[in-house]
Amino acid sequence: MIIRTPHLDYYESLQTQWLVYIISIGDTMYQINQLSFSYEKKEVLKNISITFPNNKITAIIGPNGCGKSTLLSHLYRLLPSKDKITLNQKPLESYKGREFAQLVAVLTQSRDSMIDDFLVKDIVLMGRYPYKQHFGTYSADDVKIA
């Protein structure tokens, strides 16, 4: 599963990010069941239920403040989902760090991102990080694939 929030030229003139892509690869599938979330008293997500099917691209479109980033924060566990989100039919909170990292990668694109300091090969290799052992190096196969 790769989640990315592209900064499109057309929307740059509006100085906002309106579009979120959720790309599901292989058998990885997210399912959300009646997720609600509030920042203090402001309700941002209200009873959201959606399935992001495997091998599909899902676009979430909306203006600033409608909950796109909040939804993503739940999907990659920056905010608690209280068993309202499953990944491959297993509650999101039940995944251990490395196991979750092997299933989900997040790539954001924005002007202030430090991603500009990396080569494409470096970014691709970052996706292999959860498979390395502590203080390990990338295998020859990892480097060849990248």
Regions flagged by a language model, labelled:
Residues Y30-I32, E43-N47:
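Conserved structural motif at the start of ABC-family nucleotide-binding domains
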Residues F37, N47-F52:
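Conserved A-loop
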Residues D83-E93, F100:
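Conserved ABC transporter NBD signature motif
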Residues I61-P63:
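The feature captures the beta-strand-to-loop junction immediately N-terminal to the Walker
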Residues K42-E43, R98:
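Short coil-to-beta microelement around the adenine-binding A-loop and adjacent beta1/P-loop entry
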Residues S113-A146:
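ABC-family P-loop ATPase nucleotide-binding domains
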Residues A59, R98-S110, D117, K121-L125:
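ABC nucleotide-binding domain signature
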Residues L75-Y76:
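Helix-to-loop junction immediately C-terminal to a conserved catalytic motif
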